[in-house]
Amino acid sequence: MRRAVLLLATMALVVLAAGGVALAVTKIGTNGPDTLKGTNGADTLIGKGGNDVLFSLAGRDTLLGGGGKDWLLGGNDQRPLGGDKNLVGGSGNDGVLGGEDSDTLTGNSGNDFADGGPGSDKILGGEGNDLLYDGERRGGATDTLIGGDGNDVMGPFNKPAKRDLVKCGGGFDRVLADRADVVAPDCERVAVGPAAAKELDQHIEESGFYDRIFEGLAPFPGG
C-alpha cells in the first residue's frame, strides 16, 4: 500500500510539471544534475552526466540515462496520446519506473532497480546486481524479466498468478515467482508462493527505491 501511494504521488508531480499539450521534443542534459520533462508527444530525453531525473508523459518516448545515478520515470499513459516507453539507464545505479502501457526497461550497467508497472513489459537488468520487479501484484499483463550479468533478484510474483517469463543469465540469481511463471533453467534459486512474496517485499524495502525517488526529485523546478 505504501508503495502504491508513493507511486501515485510521483505521477501526480509529473503531470503537474508538464503544463499543456506540446509537440514532441528532444532534450539533452549537461554533465551536471538535470531534470528533463517530456510533453504529450513522442519525446527523446537524454541525461548525459550527473544525477539526472527524466520524466516521460504521454507519447512513445525514449529516455536515456548517462553517467551518475539517474531516475527514469515512465509517467501516466492513460490518455489518448499514451504510448509505450523505451527507458534505458546509464552507467550508474539507476531507478527505472515504467508507465501504464507496454514498456521496455533496461538497467544497463550499475546496480539498478526497475519497476515495470502495469502493461506487458520487458525488463532487462544488464550488467550489475539488479532488482527487477514487474510492478503488478494483482494479475494483469504478462511480463518478461531478463537478468543479464550480475547477481540479480527478479520478482514476477503476482496474486492471482499470471504467466510471466524469466531468464537469468550470468551470476547467481534469485527469482521470486508465482506458480504460473515460466522460469528458465539458468536461474540458480527460485522461490514460489507466499514466501516469495514476503522476500520480494523485503528486497524492495531494503533497496530504498520508493524512499529515494523523492530525493531524486530535488532538482524538480528545472526543465
Regions found by a protein language model. Name each.
Residues 20-26:
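Sec/Tat signal peptide C-region and signal peptidase I cleavage site
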Residues 199-223:
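Composition-driven, intrinsically disordered low-complexity tracts enriched in small residues
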